[in-house]
């Protein structure tokens, strides 16, 4: 005989079957009790206090020892005590609509004020920048004017120094002329600035007249260049100042020239007919 068949046989081993039957019977009876129990008793059974709570509560001390089940009055009293012992929940108060509108209006007004202040601040910054630019331009113009004033002062000093030197030279010349030592002449193109000609003799030659000496003195430089071969002789020209005619191709006496001119002619080796 197989083992499984032997174990499943009720006659041979009824332990498992008996356990199953007892479990099902107990489950059925429990369901019947739960369905037959009232709602208040269900709540009381679910909220049954522990042993420690029962010892600490006044209900445990004052309850009737003889009564095996709590009555409905005791259950109501317990609920009343528990409700009084609990702290009330805080009430949430919602703001009213008027307060919200007032708050929004205040926020908008403050924002508008901030915008206006920012605009004013920006405008003031622009004004400050414009004033800075004007100050910079005025400083630059002042510096330019100061430079011009300094230049004018320098030029005035130079003019004063020149005028002082000219006045001093005039006084010296006047003193010399008064003493009869020196006479001021016309400073021509061949003069050294002191009335002394560089390319003519210092005194009139004795072999010619005074008029010839004056005419030769005015044109000594040109005649010297012709004699040295530096310039071609030109046609006869007229001096308007003295009204004399000077033919440059006319032979000229060497006595009209100073020693330096004679030396230059001798060095060049050229002869004059």
From Swiss-Prot:
One example of a Gene Ontology biological process annotation: spindle pole body duplication
Matching InterPro entries: Spc29
GO MF term list: structural constituent of cytoskeleton
Domain of life according to the entry: Eukaryota
Region named Disordered: 38-72, 186-212, 234-258
Gene Ontology cellular-component annotations: central plaque of spindle pole body; cytoplasm; nucleus
Pfam families: Spc29 (PF17082)
Job description of the protein: Component of the spindle pole body (SPB) required for the proper execution of spindle pole body (SPB) duplication. Links the central plaque component SPC42 to the inner plaque component SPC110.
Family: Belongs to the SPC29 family.
The protein, known as: Spindle pole component 29
Gene label: SPC29
